[in-house]
Amino acid sequence: MEPPTSHVTNAFSDSDSASVEEGGADADADVEALRRLSDNLAAAFRSPEDFAFLADARIAVPGGGGGGGDLLVHRCVLSARSPFLRGVFARRAAAAAGGGGEDGGERLELRELLGGGGEEVEVGYEALRLVLDYLYSGRVGDLPKAACLCVDEDCAHVGCHPAVAFMAQVLFAASTFQVAELTNLFQRRLLDVLDKVEVDNLLLILSVANLCNKSCMKLLERCLDMVVRSNLDMITLEKSLPPDVIKQIIDARLSLGLISPENKGFPNKHVRRIHRALDSDDVELVRMLLTEGQTNLDDAFALHYAVEHCDSKITTELLDLALADVNHRNPRGYTVLHIAARRREPKIIVSLLTKGARPADVTFDGRKAVQISKRLTKQGDYFGVTEEGKPSPKDRLCIEILEQAERRDPQLGEASVSLAMAGESLRGRLLYLENRVALARIMFPMEARVAMDIAQVDGTLEFNLGSGANPPPERQRTTVDLNESPFIMKEEHLARMTALSKTVELGKRFFPRCSNVLDKIMDDETDPVSLGRDTSAEKRKRFHDLQDVLQKAFHEDKEENDRSGLSSSSSSTSIGAIRPRR
C-alpha cells in the first residue's frame, strides 16, 4: 500500500505538467498576438494608399524617393513610441491652439525635426523609413539593398560607404527620436564592423557618434581612438569635425608622440597661406605666393586640396597654371584622381584626365580611382532608371567616365558622318556643331554641361541660328549671326567652333553612349519635317519621341526662366552623410 503522501505528490506532478503545457500554449498565443499586432500597425505605415485617410501628419524628406518625398504618419502612434516626437507634436498642437491641418494633416520638415544635427547629417528617405517602420512594428526589417550596397562586385558590403552611411543615418535618427532600443542595436552593429570600415569612413561614424553623445559613448570612444591612430591628416580632420573633437584628437596624438608640439600635425604657414587663397577662390593670389619661392604646388599638395575642398572652377584654373604634377601622391598614397573619385564631381574627373591623370594608378592598398568611386556609390543610384532629358546621377557618371578612361579607346575621327559631309562649308560645320551641342544639352544635360565647361563654351559667342529675327536685347552682345551673306569666318566664329569641337571630342572620349545616340540623330539623311511624314513606323516613332523630348525640354526651360534668371552652381560636394565644415 502506497503512503498517502505519494498520491499528493503524483497529483502535484500531474498538475505541474499540465500548467507547464498550458503556460507554453499561452506563451505561443501571446507571441502570435503580438506578431499580429505588429503586422497590423506596420500595415498602416507600409500601405499609405490604404490608410491615407487616417494619416494626420507627413514628414518631408529632401531628396527622398529620387526627388523628395513625404512619408504619411499617425501622430498617436509616433507619440506613444517616441518621447521626442510626442514633445514635437504637443508643442505644435499648443502653438496652433489645437487646430489641425487638412489633406493629410500637418507637414514636418525632416531637417527641422533633427534640429542642428540635421544640417550636418543627411538622413535619407530609406533610413527614415526603417526608423518609422520600427516605431510602428517594433521589429527591424531587412536593410534595403538599393541604399546599403555599393556597386563594386568585389566588395563584401560590410564596411563600404553605403552600408556605413545607412547605419549611421539610422543611428542618428533613432537617437534623436529617443528610441533607445533601436539606438543600441545600430550602435552594436557599427561597433561590430568598425575594424572593416575604410579609414575615410571613420569620420562619418565619429561625427554621428559625437552628435548622439551620451547614447553612443562606446562607439564615440572607440571611433575616436581609431581616428587618433590613423593616418588621416589634420587638414582633413579640421574640415570634417567640430573644434572640440579636433582638440581631443590633437591632445591624444601629442600624448602618444604621433605629432610634434610645434606644428601639432598641421602644415607650415606657407602651405596654409596657399590653402587659404584656394578657400578664397583666388588663384591669382596662389600664383603670387608661389613667386616667393617658399613652397610649390606639389609640396603644398595644392591640387589635392583644391579637388577635395574647393569649387570645380578653382581646380580647372589651378590645372591651367601647369605648375603641378597631376599624378603627384599625398602622404597617404592618394593621387589627385583618387581624391576626385571620392569627391564624385564629373567635371573635376574629366579635367584631370584631359591633363594626363592616370586612371590605372593604385593606392597603397591596391585600389584604383574607379574602385574608389564604386565603393562610394549606392546600387540604387547606379542602376536607377534616368528619364530621358533628366540629368544623370553624378555617382554613375563618374564611374562611367573612369571606366571609359581605363579602356583607352575613345572614338576617333570627325564628330560624325554629317560633319564630314559638310566639307569645306564653314557655315555648315558651325551649324552642325551648334545643333549637336544644343541637342546634347536637351537629351543629356549633365554630360553636356561637363564637356561644355571643360571646353569653355560659355566664354564664346553663341551663334544666332534664326532666320534673320533679332535676338532679345539681353542676348544681342552674346550672339553671332550665321545668316550673314556672304558668310565670312571671323575670330569669334573660330573661337566658338574650337570650343564646340572640343565639346564633341570630349563627349566622344568620355560619354560614348550619349555620342552614339546623337550620331544616329544627326546623321539621319532625312530632315525632321520629312521624317514626320515618313510612312515607316520606326522612323515615325523616332520622330515623335524626339519631338516629345524637345517639346518637354522647351517647356521646362521656359518655366525655369520664368521663375528665375541665371542659376548659380554649387560650391563643394560633401562626401557621404556629413557636410564639410568651412
Curated annotation (Swiss-Prot):
Chain intervals with Polar residues compositional bias: 1-18
ANK repeats by residue range: 229-258, 269-299, 301-328, 332-361
Annotated ranges, domain BTB: 55-140
Induction details: By mechanical wounding, treatment with jasmonic acid (JA), salicylic acid (SA) and benzothiadiazole (BTH), and in response to infestation by the rice striped stem borer Chilo suppressalis and rice leaf folder Cnaphalocrocis medinalis.
GO molecular function: salicylic acid binding; transcription coregulator activity; zinc ion binding
Stored InterPro entries: Ankyrin_rpt (IPR002110), Ankyrin_rpt-contain_sf (IPR036770), BTB/POZ_dom (IPR000210), NPR (IPR044292), NPR1/NIM1-like_C (IPR021094), NPR_central_dom (IPR024228), SKP1/BTB/POZ_sf (IPR011333)
Binding of Zn(2+), residues: 150, 155, 157, 160
Zinc finger (C2HC NPR-type): 147-161
First-listed, main subcellular location of the protein, grouped into a coarse class: cytoplasm
Segments for region (Salicylic acid-binding core (SBC)): 391-526
Pathway: Protein modification; protein ubiquitination
Stretches with biased composition (Basic and acidic residues): 553-563
Keywords in alphabetical order: ANK repeat, Cytoplasm, Disulfide bond, Metal-binding, Nucleus, Plant defense, Repeat, Ubl conjugation pathway, Zinc, Zinc-finger
Spans annotated as Disordered: 1-25, 551-582
GO cellular component: cytoplasm; nuclear body; nucleus; RNA polymerase II transcription regulator complex
Composition-biased stretches (Low complexity): 564-574
Family according to the record: Belongs to the plant 'ANKYRIN-BTB/POZ' family. 'NPR1-like' subfamily.
PANTHER family tied to this protein: REGULATORY PROTEIN NPR2, REGULATORY PROTEIN NPR3
Domain notes: The BTB/POZ domain mediates the interaction with some component of ubiquitin ligase complexes.
Described purpose of this protein according to its UniProt entry: Salicylic acid (SA)-binding substrate-specific adapter of an E3 ubiquitin-protein ligase complex (CUL3-RBX1-BTB) which mediates the ubiquitination and subsequent proteasomal degradation of target proteins.
Name by which UniProt lists this protein: BTB/POZ domain and ankyrin repeat-containing protein NPR1
